[in-house]
A protein has these predicted regions:
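Zinc-dependent deaminase catalytic domain
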Residues: 1-130, 134-287
Length: 287
């Protein structure tokens, strides 16, 4: 089911209509700039957080949950003031462990867009332990605030006391501290390699990324590692999440995975999901 079809299920409210109008003008890219947020907060006389809470049903429309049928929306707020929407993404044909959680979705959306720091995460259900651990990898983890419909302004570490994270492993440059892509690659292979070089992998040092060809657009997803390993974001999931949140409708025709030489490889899991989800044979580049 298309994302725009999901919007028809939303209640007919002025604030919902105003946000959907903005999204429609940008081809349903699930993002609001700081300027758009400021204008809409002023129009409806809402604080930034109350406005984000009102946007959660819209964010949840980007969910793809054929297994659980449990639709979670999240919004990551950058220090820029930009809103990055996210939603859970499930894949029927592979391990359930490859699911993208809504908080991960929103945070990776922000990371892919070049945001440097997240101040707040707004979500319509209490974060699970997996997401709490994932958020603890952020450079803003010590000050990150979590907001729920029933409870606002909660410190991340109130959900994750005595937390284990990158600082326990003497990692000082955390997720969102690293480099971002700075050029526009001319082809899919170059795009995958350049994205891989911007991976966050301080534990394995694996540089890994996927590039998707969707019509005339190239969409990439980078590997983002976690101190606890299991909550790490795989590059294909990151790319597919970004594809969906961009509002893309063009079919994916090619997939390239690029990796450096490392103790790890995401080749097997990536190829399996590409075959199961897209019906394609992925291409592999070692650099």
């Amino acid at each position: 089911m298309s994302i725009s079809t999901n919007f028809f299920r939303l209640p007919n409210m002025p604030i919902t209509s105003a946000v959907l109008t903005q999204l429609a003008e940008q081809h349903y890219h699930a993002y609001l700039s700081a300027e758009q947020v400021k204008a809409l907060c002023g129009q409806f006389q809402l604080s930034q957080i109350d406005f984000a809470l009102a946007c959660l049903p819209i964010a949840a429309c980007y969910s793809k949950a054929p297994i659980s049928e449990f639709y979670v929306g999240a919004i990551a707020i950058g220090e820029s003031g930009n809103f990055y929407f996210g939603a859970n993404q499930e894949f029927e044909s592979v391990s359930i462990g490859q699911t993208v959680h809504a908080e991960q979705s929103a945070l990776m959306h922000a990371w892919q867009m070049g945001e440097k720091r997240i101040t707040d995460v707004v979500v319509n259900y209490t974060p699970c332990g997996h997401c709490r651990q994932f958020m603890n990898e952020l450079n803003s983890a010590p000050t990150l605030r979590i907001h729920l419909p029933h409870s606002q302004n909660n410190a991340l570490h109130s959900y994750l006391p005595d937390a284990f994270g990158p600082r326990n492993l003497n990692i000082t440059d955390c997720l969102f501290d690293g480099p971002t892509q700075t050029t526009q690659p001319v082809n899919l292979t170059e795009a995958a390699i350049e994205a891989a070089r911007s991976s966050y992998a301080p534990y394995s040092h694996l540089q890994s990324a996927v590039a998707l060809q969707a019509g005339e657009r190239i969409i990439t997803g980078r590997y983002a590692e976690n101190a606890a390993f299991n909550p790490s974001m795989l590059p294909l999931q990151n790319a597919l999440n970004f594809y969906r949140l961009q509002g893309e409708t063009a079919s994916i025709s090619r997939v390239v995975l690029a990796e450096n030489q490392s103790k790890l490889s995401k080749k097997e899991s990536t190829f399996a999901l590409v075959k199961a989800e897209l019906g394609l044979e992925a291409e592999y580049i070692a650099f």
